[in-house]
Amino acid sequence: MSHANLWIDGNWVQGQGKSWNTCNPVSQQVVWQGNEATAQQVEQACEAARQAFPQWATTSLTDRIAIIERFALLLEQNKEALAKIISQETSKPLWETLTEVQSMVAKVAISIRAYHQRTGKSITEMADGAASLRHRPHGVMAVFGPYNFPGHLPNGHIVPALIAGNVVVFKPSELTPWTAEATVKLWQQAGLPNAVLNLLQGSRETGIALAQSEHIDGVLFTGSASTGYQLHRQLAGAPEKILALEMGGNNALIIEDIDDIDAVVHLAIQSAFISAGQRCTCARRLIIKNGQAGDAFIQRFIEVARDLVIGDWDAEPQPFMGGVISVKAAEALLKAQQNLIDLGARSLLEMKQLRENSALVSPAILDVTAVPDIPDEEYFGPLTCIYRYDDFDEALKLANSTRFGLSVGLVSPKRALFERMLIEARAGIVNWNKPLTGASSAAPFGGVGASGNHRASAFYAADYCAWPMASLESEQLSLPEKLSPGIVL
């Protein structure tokens, strides 16, 4: 039944908007029920955050970090419980959600290091004083979280924002409210002062109200390109607000050379189908060189993909992947598969719904080499398209033939080709003999084009959580030895 599912100004209150529930995508068992925040409750949260900002911003960095490190300790202590919540809400296997919570823990130390390296304080001595650089927090930051990593990805905005001295109003995906609620309760236990972090639950209307609030100073978003573009339009004409958009991709993995076929297949499986294809860096396109080696790779890739273990989050032994986020998402993927076939794609491995009224789907592999005008879309699930090519010029052209620019990868022992990709590829992440889905929180994460607005997250999140303040300083004022022309003193 519904409960107090909003955290506003240090109090748990029930949403006054429409009620809704979330279900496990595979079993359809209801796992959470609650009510949306109304526009009035959105304003209450934003006003409370505005009131809390001055005190939090002037709290010493040492004291802010102490609270944030207590949160990390609580995450570690509650790792399995939170991982089970994420698994029940998303259907991701427990092995994977345990790694997600561990990434949340690690984010704290990494973000502290990034704060000092990217946005700390520095002083340069000068003959007549000093030049200093400091960084100041923006104020009230609206954080919009996605459903695919409902713990880790919002955490990647919230932690650096709080370290820098900002306050946060957090709206998670309406598909994963339970994870957000459980995470915020850990922040509460950590001793975060009232209204420094506020939680709003709801769908599109709640998000629009939050983005339009006059009390916010910035929006930090991870999610689809369509929603990101909508937020960009909403904030048009508001240059005083910082906007960080981390969106999707139509990512390409170029397979040029195949020495160890199973090693390449494993890399491709991890790139295309991990998390049921619901990572923004997943390989939506496999660009494979023509020839017998490429033919053999495709055959082996199909065999391994067909045999992937897909099942419930708590099954033993553990599956490689669970379902996609909802039955609606599964149906959309099946429709996308059929649309591609209707355009002329050749199905090499057909995606099927594995259980009735369930989000469990098998992988799809389609050859679209001879198909003109393939839609430049992000199919957010275990669906990948194969393109064949003859020379590397053609492969690079194919890889760059997208409005997105998140990630691209190369499989080849030839470093010269990788060096060329580093110059010619249009993507924020360029990997070499590594899965596209591999990323490091100690590096920036983001893309160009429809994948983002040049506000990389991860280690560079510190950059959009504070603004630089430059100063020329001198403890004493004295008349210069030489005056400018035209001045008589």
UniProtKB/Swiss-Prot annotation:
Pathway this chain belongs to: Amino-acid degradation; L-arginine degradation via AST pathway; L-glutamate and succinate from L-arginine: step 4/5
Residue sites binding NAD(+) per the record: G223, S224, A225, S226, T227, G228
Keywords: Arginine metabolism, NAD, Oxidoreductase
Pfam (any one): Aldedh
Documented EC number(s): 1.2.1.71
Catalytic site positions: E246, C280
Catalyzed reactions per annotation: N-succinyl-L-glutamate 5-semialdehyde + NAD(+) + H2O = N-succinyl-L-glutamate + NADH + 2 H(+)
BP terms from Gene Ontology: arginine catabolic process to glutamate; arginine catabolic process to succinate
PANTHER family: ALDEHYDE DEHYDROGENASE-RELATED
Xref: HAMAP family: Aldedh_AstD
Assigned protein family: Belongs to the aldehyde dehydrogenase family. AstD subfamily.
General function of this protein: Catalyzes the NAD-dependent reduction of succinylglutamate semialdehyde into succinylglutamate.
The protein's name in its UniProt record: N-succinylglutamate 5-semialdehyde dehydrogenase
Source organism: Acinetobacter baylyi (strain ATCC 33305 / BD413 / ADP1)
